[in-house]
From Swiss-Prot:
Chain positions found as Phosphoserine: 38, 531, 580, 661, 663
UniProt free text on domains: Ca(2+) and ATP binding cause major rearrangements of the cytoplasmic and transmembrane domains. According to the E1-E2 model, Ca(2+) binding to the cytosolic domain of the pump in the high-affinity E1 conformation is followed by the ATP-dependent phosphorylation of the active site Asp, giving rise to E1P. A conformational change of the phosphoenzyme gives rise to the low-affinity E2P state that exposes the Ca(2+) ions to the lumenal side and promotes Ca(2+) release. Dephosphorylation of the active site Asp mediates the subsequent return to the E1 conformation. PLN and SLN both have a single transmembrane helix; both occupy a similar binding site that is situated between the ATP2A2 transmembrane helices.
Biological process (GO), any one: positive regulation of endoplasmic reticulum calcium ion concentration
Organism of this sequence: Rattus norvegicus (Rat)
SUPFAM superfamilies xref list: Calcium ATPase, transduction domain A, Calcium ATPase, transmembrane domain M, HAD-like, Metal cation-transporting ATPase, ATP-binding domain N
Annotated protein name in UniProt: Sarcoplasmic/endoplasmic reticulum calcium ATPase 2
């Protein structure tokens, strides 16, 4: 039934053709069940395991690798001789990597879809209904309830469907609907129509929503919606319809994969076409097909060389390390890619209750009467410190602590707070915190009594459990609570009837009253001044109400409660307590004692975090279900708004937002910093608008109502104390529910991205080098310098370790003083592409050069000519060009070993270059990142392992090297450092001046002291002797060029 909240009870019952006392007939139930189905949320049809596995192979890079593995496998199948076993190593290793990646991907996907299933925990199992087949109430399975059913609900029940209340059988009905609306206190319900058809859920005071809990009272109602038509069902549909966005990093890697695949395809085709003339060479037995297959194998090797196989593993490792660091800061990351997304967050949409505030109602101000003279009076105003339920804080007057027992008015005020109260404090030993037992408002009063300690109770030596209610217990020992007159909407107050535990002539029964100031003060005839009772005059009443109005509408927007006493109430037997309409008669002729002002206070550390966000160029938007006045007041206190800032176009209620045109709504999302009284649909709409501006949005939430927006935003952040639905729909969970933790996580995300950029570039330059190497050997007609299994080893192991270590680079000191990076900013800029292309070309040329050196100039090598080397495929005994040359020498493992050793060594030097994007190694020595030094040592040790430990040399088709050969490797490798230092110098001084923190604002002088400033002399002293020794030793290097 649409808009049931706007209809009268009679209209709703008439719509379903049902009587409240008898319920539906079995025939009606059958028809309604056929029409509306079961009252349950349908199970989400998840993807099958096969679908999830296939999905993991949709990535372009993965598909290219898979194709390369399949082709390698087919080629290995037809391999002959000794190479048969080693030929299978390459496809096997590639497939192993792909399977491992797929397993990780499937595991993450499985976790992600739990959010929709978690909604089922809010479905009650049973419900109590009236139906015509039985004369009394009957318990049935909640899934069998249909629209039109008459349902009975009482305290402790979970509401089984969306229900329009028809009658309330207790004084009041309170409902905890925080999971759905985010309201921090339980809501009082009534049966009157709410005429507004566009009312938000918070304002539908005559409706009960499926999955919410009855906090107090008993009532009956008619079911108006079941299953997916309930409010919680609509949230489920919204979550199902929400597609998960790919993170900026995933998008960048997708783009990179596309570009790389095109480049790889072009180079592979080019290599194959260049060598068409060699297809008929004698080495292939004169068979054109054999020659074509041989060069096709080289093209496949090229594809393997060009793809950074280690990149997914290194990225996963780096993100996993980042999650561990975040976990130490109380941010538990559920989705690895979201770690990096945090780094480019430009908007944080934060819930108010529990995130920006403590969600622990706290009395912060109170007043009692000091003096009264006719129509004028003066007040004693007090402030109270402490912003949690912990009974720690003090009462201050004019910023100085006071002893409360010195004020009679405060003693009576504390007595009312303790006795007119059904809540208590409890110390949770497991969590180590004080928690509320009962209502938030009443717990705040209990905590206030503990801070006041009006009877000067000795508190030292008490355990934390005993301390929780020590002062309240002293007051409760003095008077006994006989009965309670429950809160009702008409009088807006509640009271308790108390008698002294030790009767005497002076002590007598009293009624203590608390409630909304306008309701209580209108029924006060007197005011308490010290221990005396003075008549209430219009002037005094006006003064009291003006202070209360100021507290309620000022910068604090406090929730005020008036506290009063009835000194001479009727005796219990004279009261008619069966009818709650009589309660107001017994709460008249009251004496006003004082007033307390409370609020859900902002967390202490939030203001500094909001300031840090502003410095970092991140906009903070508060989105709350609370009312606008309270929301704006908290915004002012934490710095989202300035104290006197005009919030006309910067703060909206859900209703005001709905009334705007679509273009005005877009503009509102661009400028607003506060949305109050909102529903789940508003949150999702706000996220959509922000995403249309290319903003990267982090959304916080804890309730079921937050789940769709958490899932839709780039970063969904759930509270540790939140619902299971919110947690499973989000990428990150805050263990301490603290906004400041988000800011710390953003900082960590930025540092991770910077480091990730370094190792991605490092791996790419390595792959460029491998591609250039294979392309050069094919173009020059040289024997293979590197084979696929060697390239896999380099890409996965020897490159992977330093790349992972680069994730430990220390973050920049000014990382939170820069605006968020543009998510569309390329991973590699034009200059950096040129830089790494230049380095890559040197890596490739050096690798080919090392292999050529062994053939042409090395002692112990064949010393063939360049022509013979470039036409080695024509080598046979009867060819005069190869007279005296043993053709088997062209299959020697030495040149491959030289090429592989140069490639590994040069990559270690390149890792040192990647320590900083633009800073010189002379100023930032390797030990700035000790993990990098360790990983380089480990990579070189692994290289020695495959060189010198049998049978590894056989698998990798390499052989041990002697000292001269190692010196040659170093001679060829070390210049890459000089080359990158030159490119860094150009970047620092001509292309990106001022980007480095160390860069001086003025042009540096050319004096020797200025040039040597900041140089790490220990590094210079360490490296210089090595360089001199390497380059002073003769290795026949020049013979290669003069032969």
């Amino acid at each position: 039934m649409e808009n049931a909240h706007t209809k009268t009870v009679e209209e709703v019952l008439g719509h379903f053709g049902v009587n409240e006392s008898t319920g539906l007939s079995l025939e009606q139930v059958k028809k309604l069940k056929e029409r509306w189905g079961s009252n349950e949320l349908p199970a989400e049809e998840g993807k099958t395991l096969l679908e999830l596995v296939i999905e993991q192979f949709e990535d372009l890079l993965v598909r290219i690798l898979l194709l390369a593995a399949c082709i390698s496998f087919v080629l290995a199948w037809f391999e002959e001789g000794e190479e048969t076993i080693t030929a299978f190593v390459e496809p096997f290793v590639i497939l192993l990597i792909l399977v491992a990646n797929a397993i990780v991907g499937v595991w993450q996907e499985r976790n992600a879809e739990n959010a929709i299933e978690a909604l089922k925990e809010y479905e009650p199992e049973m419900g109590k209904v009236y139906r015509q087949d039985r004369k009394s109430v009957q318990r049935i399975k909640a899934k069998d309830i249909v629209p039109g059913d008459i349902v009975e609900i009482a305290v402790g029940d979970k509401v089984p469907a969306d229900i329009r209340l028809t009658s309330i059988k207790s004084t009041t009905l309170r409902v905890d609907q925080s999971i759905l609306t985010g309201e921090s206190v339980s809501v009082i319900k009534h049966t009157d129509p709410v005429p507004d058809p566009r009312a938000v859920n918070q304002d539908k005071k005559n409706m009960l929503f499926s999955g919410t809990n009855i906090a107090a009272g008993k009532a009956m109602g008619v079911v108006v919606a079941t299953g997916v038509n309930t409010e919680i069902g609509k949230i489920r549909d919204e979550m199902v319809a929400t597609e998960q966005e790919r993170t900026p990093l995933q998008q960048k890697l997708d783009e990179f994969g596309e570009q790389l695949s095109k480049v790889i395809s072009l180079i592979c085709i080019a290599v194959w076409i260049i060598n068409i003339g060699h297809f008929n060479d004698p080495v292939h037995g004169g068979s054109w097909i054999r020659g074509a297959i041989y060069y096709f194998k080289i093209a496949v090797a090229l594809a393997v060389a060009a793809i950074p196989e280690g990149l997914p593993a290194v990225i996963t490792t780096c993100l996993a390390l980042g999650t561990r660091r975040m976990a130490k800061k109380n941010a538990i990351v559920r989705s690895l890619p979201s770690v990096e997304t945090l780094g480019c967050t430009s908007v944080i949409c934060s819930d108010k209750t529990g995130t920006l505030t403590t969600n622990q109602m706290s009395v912060c101000r109170m007043f009692i009467l000091d003096k009264v003279e006719g129509d004028t009076c003066s007040l004693n105003e007090f402030t109270i410190t402490g912003s949690t339920y912990a009974p720690i804080g003090e009462v201050q007057k004019d910023d100085k602590p006071v002893k409360c027992h010195q004020y009679d008015g405060l003693v009576e005020l504390a007595t009312i707070c303790a006795l007119c109260n059904d809540s208590a404090l409890d110390y949770n030993e497991a969590k180590g915190v004080y928690e509320k037992v009962g209502e938030a408002t009443e717990t705040a009063l209990t905590c206030l009594v503990e801070k006041m300690n009006v009877f000067d109770t000795e508190l030292k030596g008490l355990s934390k459990i005993e301390r929780a209610n020590a002062c309240n217990s002293v007051i409760k020992q003095l008077m006994k609570k006989e009965f309670t007159l429950e809160f009702s909407r008409d009088r807006k107050s509640m009271s308790v009837y108390c008698t002294p535990n030790k009767p005497s002539r002076t002590s007598m029964s009293k009624m203590f009253v608390k409630g909304a100031p306008e309701g209580v003060i209108d029924r006060c005839t007197h005011i308490r001044v010290g221990s005396t009772k003075v008549p209430m005059t219009p002037g005094v009443k006006q003064k009291i109400m003006s202070v209360i109005r100021e507290w309620g509408s000022g910068s604090d927007t406090l929730r005020c409660l008036a506290l009063a006493t009835h000194d001479n109430p009727l005796r219990r037997e004279e009261m008619h307590l069966e009818d709650s309409a009589n309660f107001i008669k017994y709460e008249t002729n009251l004496t006003f004692v004082g007033c307390v002002g409370m609020l859900d206070p902002p967390r202490i550390e939030v203001a500094s975090s909001v300031k840090l966000c502003r410095q970092a160029g991140i906009r903070v938007i508060m989105i709350t279900g609370d009312n606008k006045g309270t929301a704006v007041a908290i915004c002012r206190r934490i710095g989202i708004f300035g104290q006197d800032e005009d919030v006309t176009s910067k703060a909206f209620t859900g209703r005001e937002f709905d009334e705007l045109s679509p273009s005005a709504q877009r503009d509102a999302c661009l400028n607003a910093r506060c949305f109050a009284r909102v529903e789940p649909s508003h949150k999702s709409k706000i996220v959509e608008f922000l995403q249309s501006f290319d903003e990267i949005t982090a959304m916080t939430g804890d309730g079921v109502n937050d789940a769709p927006a958490l899932k839709k935003s780039e970063i969904g952040i759930a509270m540790g104390s939140g619902t299971a639905v919110a947690k499973t729909a989000s990428e990150m969970v805050l263990a301490d529910d603290n906004f400041s933790t988000i800011v710390a996580a953003v900082e960590e995300g930025r540092a991770i991205y910077n480091n990730m950029k370094q190792f991605i570039r490092y791996l790419i330059s390595s792959n460029v080098g491998e591609v250039v190497c294979i392309f050069l050997t094919a173009a020059l007609g040289f024997p293979e310098a590197l084979i696929p299994v060697q390239l896999l080893w380099v890409n996965l192991v020897t490159d992977g370790l330093p790349a992972t270590a680069l994730g430990f680079n220390p973050p920049d000191l000014d990382i939170m003083n820069k605006p968020p990076r543009n998510p569309k900013e390329p991973l590699i800029s034009g200059w950096l592409f040129f830089r790494y292309l230049a380095i890559g070309c040197y890596v490739g040329a050096a690798t080919v050069g090392a292999a050529a050196w062994w053939f042409i100039a090395a002692d112990g090598g064949p010393r063939v000519s360049f022509y013979q080397l470039s036409h080695f495929l024509q080598c046979k005994e009867d060819n005069p060009d190869f007279e005296g040359v043993d053709c088997a020498i062209f299959e020697s493992p030495y040149p491959m070993t030289m090429a592989l050793s140069v490639l590994v060594t040069i990559e270690m030097c390149n890792a040192l270059n990647s320590l900083s994007e633009n800073q010189s190694l002379l100023r930032m020595p390797p030990w700035e990142n000790i993990w990098l030094v360790g990983s380089i040592c480990l990579s070189m040790s692994l290289h020695f392992l495959i060189l010198y430990v049998e049978p590894l040399p056989l698998i990798f088709q390499i052989t041990p090297l002697n000292l001269t050969q190692w010196l040659m490797v170093l001679k060829i490798s070390l210049p890459v450092i000089l080359m990158d230092e030159t490119l860094k110098f150009v970047a620092r001084n001509y292309l990106e001046p001022g980007k480095e923190c160390a860069q001086p604002a003025t042009k540096p002088s050319c004096s020797l002291s200025a040039c040597t400033d900041g140089i790490s002399w220990p590094f210079v002293l360490l490296i210089m002797p090595l360089v001199v020794w390497v380059y002073s030793t003769d290795t026949n290097f020049s013979d290669m060029f003069w032969s």
